[in-house]
Amino acid sequence: MTITCNLYIDGQWHDAEDRRTFTRRHPAQDDVASVAAAASLADGKRCVEAAASAFPQWRDTLPAERRRLLLDAAEHMLLREAKFIAAMAAETGATAH
């Protein structure tokens, strides 16, 4: 299973600006575990600009709503727990359990 990891900037998925990627291989089997966008300085700048633009809305979000959003994000991660474990095991050569 090969996982593709792109850049999530300003609410959308993107390739790296120059389309460069880096590949991680399973250390024991030499299979490709993941291919990730290799962010450039320009990509980093876009990330910083998007974060700065989003901050006022986050700053003004009430604590209870922030809590709800973060708990929702945690729930989405838990629903994909097996995929996270498989990806980390493949990239590091570790066992899943």
PLM features: residue spans?
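Terminal low-complexity tails and localization/encapsulation signals of metabolic enzymes
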Residues: 1-36, 68-72
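Glycine-rich loop-to-alpha-helix module at the N-terminal edge of alpha/beta enzyme cores
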Residues: 29-97
